[in-house]
């Protein structure tokens, strides 16, 4: 298993700087991009950022990047990645999402199917399994995503599961409550300090107030998110 990964913390448009600041406060060097912030870290970093980032949506591992102008290039690119360092024998690995933007490859279901085939072939080769015998996917789930932008494919593994905004205390919600990570970003951008009054003009479900209260007592999202994905990934749960 690899000791260091390239990771991305995804964020809503316009909130990348807030997520980058949170990462730097945790001690990581960052590279801010559209909709995400890149950083390097090991297994501990995956757990730590899933636990403590408040404005991010998800934490994903970048498995690899390569040109993909044809389905053959896509297959060979996915096949060439070192999947044995990410997926244990028996793991479930659905290609949960494919996105193609401004690229020659645009049929997203086909991208998913080709990518799945490539991962299966690679694991069959590594674990010495016959090609005609399907892999048993009965273990922990590792959701794989393939994004192709301007003919460049990026392959990722989602480590979060349920989006981090679902860390809330609510058992019910109204028509359009603000997401907890958006509330956290608003509070960060407002430069509010604990010695000042905090007023939530929308009130409603008191998301902004409760988000700040959770922050003040350093409530970990793991305690509020019982379906936290990393708890189910046996290969990483020792962290």
Language-model segments: which ranges?
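Non-catalytic nucleic-acid substrate-recognition regions in nucleic-acid-modifying enzymes
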Residues: 2-140
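Generic beta-strand structural signal
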Residues: 32, 148, 229-231
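Beta-rich nucleic-acid/ligand-interaction surfaces
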Residues: 38, 137-146, 203-206
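A generic local secondary-structure boundary/capping motif
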Residues: 83-85, 134-135, 143-145, 188-189, ...
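C-terminal edge-of-domain segments
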Residues: 144-157
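SAM-dependent Rossmann-like transferase core, predominantly class I methyltransferases
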Residues: 155-189
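Conserved S-adenosyl-L-methionine
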Residues: 178-239
